[in-house]
Amino acid sequence: MLFSDFKFSHCIRAVTLLGGILLSAVAQSHGRAATVSNDVRAIEFPDTASYQTLVVDLHTHSVFSDGHVWPKIRVEEALRDRLDALAITEHLEYQPHRADILHPDRNRAYDIAADAAKNSDLIVIRGSEITRDAPAGHINAVFIDDANKLIKVDKPPADTSDVLAYYSAAKEWPAQKAVEAAHAQNAFIFWNHPYWTRQAPDGIARMNKFHSANARNGVLHGIEIANGSTYSEEAFQLALDYNLTLVGVSDVHDLIDWDYKPHDGGHRPVTLVFAKAKTAAAIKEALFARRTVVWFRNLLIGREQHLQPLLAASLSASPLSYRATTYIAEVTLNNVSDADFNLRYTGDYTFMNNADRITVPAHGQIKLQIKPGKRSKKLTLPFVVENTLTAPGKHAQIEIEVAE
């Protein structure tokens, strides 16, 4: 073989290889998501004694409404955060990208995301955001069958690419009709960010006749108490007063990495769902049964009966021991969850190496040296868990029993 022939044949092989790589990259960029997760940013909480603890984000957006990424990117982010379930809930009426993406089928974002997740165990939930002015505000419906039945535009504008004109025409259909259409599909329906300052200028969530009637009639099932970078004590109290499911969401429009910086220790707000199995049906059942805890900026927010089993599963203690020739007891507290637990000791003993406030780091441990004054075979250590809320202003309390 001549040198020129040799060089030519290797060029052909290189071009063929490069072409295959490019075709693969193009196919993946528009097709299924890679099953990638990053242990540093993975959101992990243990199962409780009775249920699987599933990590869920029920409010996100893509370019099919006012988000800025393709639905596949939402799936990729969810895989990196090791979510168990994700809903891409596009605004039905507000379509700011209409000039570029006409979006006649409101199920399209779900279809793309579901296809992208096929090679993974991520559950993609079909959902939409009903978008109105107050008092209805914004409402998410998840576990729907067909998003197209939740919108009706009787008199579309002459220029259908006019975003505001289209939105004005679309919101003429009564919000109650849209909610009832979702309810007819057995959807789980929740009130989004009721403290949003564009509709509640003082930032205080207040119940109104529209939502109270739907809650009373079993048509409103949940309420966001944490959305993006915001949390509302008033919304939390409304959830307790009206027996609504606690929901926490990212409501991400840009990138999770930009908004929440998981590479720097941050995390998106999520809803921890205590389900009987890792299935869409089990998640739906748990949401209707109100078995949730919200994780927001390292704060765990939930009803006492749901938060306590999670704390019990997350925190444990080593056997009790004593330093030689002393009455100084030693015990190690272990944490298998993603939350740093900020504990305030409320018992009668004091510590050798700590004051009354102790942090048990996420997936870490801390060794305590306790001064009980004598050698006992068993000690009870009561704590207030300060990064928890079981009601506005009320923290969970635990007792850790340690024995030799």
Indicate residue ranges for each PLM-predicted region.
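Bacterial N-terminal signal peptides that target proteins for export
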Residues: 2-16
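A metal-dependent hydrolase metal-coordination microenvironment
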Residues: 39-188, 192, 218, 225, ...
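Short gly/pro/ser/thr-enriched loop/turn and capping motifs at secondary-structure boundaries
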Residues: 93-95, 198, 253-256
